C-alpha cells in the first residue's frame, strides 16, 4: 500500500512537468515556425 500511495503522489507531479515541457516546446516551435493556419498581414 505504501508503494501505491507513493505512486499516486508522484505521477501527477511527473505529468505536470511533462505537460509543461511539451506546451513550452510547442509554443517555442510555433514562435520560430509559425502555423500556416494563422496569417498575419
From Swiss-Prot:
Q: Which domain of life is it from?
A: Eukaryota
Give its localization: Plastid, Chloroplast thylakoid membrane
Q: Main localisation, per the record? A: plastid
Q: Which cellular components does GO assign to this protein?
A: chloroplast thylakoid membrane; photosystem I
Describe its membrane topology. Single-pass membrane protein
Q: Which InterPro entries match?
A: PSI_PsaJ, PSI_PsaJ_sf
What residues form the membrane-spanning segments?
7-27
Alphabetical list of Pfam families matching this protein: PSI_PsaJ
Q: Which UniProt keywords apply?
A: Chloroplast, Membrane, Photosynthesis, Photosystem I, Plastid, Thylakoid, Transmembrane, Transmembrane helix
Q: Where is the signal peptide?
A: none
Q: Name one GO biological process term.
A: photosynthesis
Role this protein plays: May help in the organization of the PsaE and PsaF subunits.
Name the protein family.
Belongs to the PsaJ family.
Q: What is this protein called?
A: Photosystem I reaction center subunit IX
Amino acid at each position: 500500500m505504501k508503494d501505491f500511495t507513493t505512486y499516486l503522489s508522484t505521477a501527477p507531479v511527473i505529468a505536470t512537468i511533462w505537460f509543461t515541457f511539451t506546451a513550452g516546446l510547442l509554443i517555442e516551435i510555433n514562435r520560430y515556425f509559425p502555423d500556416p493556419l494563422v496569417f498575419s498581414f
